[in-house]
Amino acid sequence: MAWNTNLRWRLPLTCLLLQVVMVILFGVFVRYDFEADAHWWSERTHKNLSDVENEFYYRYPSFQDVHVMVFVGFGFLMTFLQRYGFSAVGFNFLLAAFGIQWALLMQGWFHFLQGRYIVVGVENLINADFCVASVCVAFGAVLGKVSPIQLLIMTFFQVTLFAVNEFILLNLLKVKDAGGSMTIHTFGAYFGLTVTRILYRRNLEQSKERQNSVYQSDLFAMIGTLFLWMYWPSFNSAISYHGDSQHRAAINTYCSLAACVLTSVAISSALHKKGKLDMVHIQNATLAGGVAVGTAAEMMLMPYGALIIGFVCGIISTLGFVYLTPFLESRLHIQDTCGINNLHGIPGIIGGIVGAVTAASASLEVYGKEGLVHSFDFQGFKGDWTARTQGKFQIYGLLVTLAMALMGGIIVGLILRLPFWGQPSDENCFEDAVYWEMPEGNSTVYIPEDPTFKPSGPSVPSVPMVSPLPMASSVPLVP
């Protein structure tokens, strides 16, 4: 089926409408947190505080790292498609910019409401980035097959569902999920996989040649991998309690990521008959350890435990890219462009299970009495909880997340199937030229619904033949 992909009025109107709504809602509901307000001066004097004690100085370095991961790491990781680099980075930029605004509102209404106002500080910015990271994960499943309008619609609904799921887990079930193995990765992955299943394209084979990478596109994607890999310790520790919890989360993530690289390389080489490495595995499976250690990151997992998690996830993720992704596409009709099930889905579930087991096995000998109370908030509502109770609720949180992702993905997928969102036809998927003005001679797309459009020439422009210069040895020497 061919759809009209001319977005001249639809995209501008959608973007402007959403932004105007954001301006109005921010004007009505959003104010600065007291540490960002000018009244901080009187508060500081009254409580004898120093500017250095402002939350900004504790949290902003982590916020910077998380921000880079969302906009640079995820964006460039998805540039592996040979003709979809503009869209991978550009649409990631678009959905993230809208998503952080909507996330500040949705999370604010659930977590940061004081009176009738949402108070915004640096911690809100980190949480909004976490929410958008989940959207970026889901984007990987539908990459190349949807229009920017569909992505904005998906972002709107996913951020809403993310905030609801996060509230249920963190506020009602009292789950610990510092690095978001459940709330971010599991939810984002299975929401995205459900959406892409609903949007299944029977004739996607017509765009199969564009679904491959080339040398340069893989190199750009590797840049995204390195940014994600380097900053993941900040991601998993960004909102942990100051002091030992945050310190522990960074160490555990660091160790898990390091182990994951070695096992990913080992399995990738072992699965090739000539022992060669597959760049897809190195770009993605090497990050699975950071996903899986997220829930238990601030727990007393021990460095060797983090290494074991990374070791196992490197193996499972690489095997998933080789065997599971083709199976899901051929048997279940799940067209997972980026293989997010192997990088975020399965490692996220592993992370949820590891978090439950680690919480259930917590003891006074390992944590100490005060450390146990502080690490799991065993006070107030949870005053009579035991470690086993915490572990049980961790599992409940994982199950709720999966249910929310699957049900939400079905509903949003059905909305995105409507024919007026400007989605590309099956033969024009994974092609920048559908939505972007391309440099001369860099488009092979054909849009039959636009009679004025003429497909351009070959993707590699012809170069006039030039006689080669003579070799140095053949040039006569002047005596």
Swiss-Prot record:
Keywords: Ammonia transport, Cell membrane, Glycoprotein, Membrane, Transmembrane, Transmembrane helix, Transport. Ammonium transporter involved in the maintenance of acid-base homeostasis. Transports ammonium and its related derivative methylammonium across the plasma membrane of epithelial cells likely contributing to renal transepithelial ammonia transport and ammonia metabolism. Postulated to primarily mediate an electroneutral bidirectional transport of NH3 ammonia species according to a mechanism that implies interaction of an NH4(+) ion with acidic residues of the pore entry followed by dissociation of NH4(+) into NH3 and H(+). The gene is RHCG. The keyword Transport applies. Residues 31-60, 107-123, 170-177, 240-250, 303, 367-394 are extracellular. It catalyses: NH4(+)(in) = NH4(+)(out); methylamine(out) = methylamine(in); CO2(out) = CO2(in). InterPro entries: Ammonium/urea_transptr, NH4_transpt_AmtB-like_dom, RhesusRHD. Gene3D superfamilies: Ammonium transporter AmtB like domains. Residues 1-9, 82-85, 145-148, 201-218, 272-281, 325-345, 416-479 are cytoplasmic. GO terms for molecular function: ammonium channel activity; ankyrin binding; carbon dioxide transmembrane transporter activity. Homotrimer. It is a multi-pass membrane protein. The lineage of its organism: Eukaryota, Metazoa, Chordata, Craniata, Vertebrata. GO terms for cellular component: apical plasma membrane; basolateral plasma membrane; cytoplasmic vesicle; plasma membrane. GO terms for biological process: ammonium homeostasis; ammonium transmembrane transport; intracellular monoatomic ion homeostasis; transepithelial ammonium transport. PANTHER family: AMMONIUM TRANSPORTER, AMMONIUM TRANSPORTER RH TYPE C. N-glycosylated. The chain crosses the membrane at residues 10-30, 61-81, 86-106, 124-144, 149-169, 178-200, 219-239, 251-271, 282-302, 304-324, 346-366, 395-415. Belongs to the ammonium transporter (TC 2.A.49) family. Rh subfamily. It is found in: Cell membrane; Apical cell membrane. It comes from the Eukaryota. Glycans are attached at residue 48. It comes from Pan troglodytes. This is Ammonium transporter Rh type C.
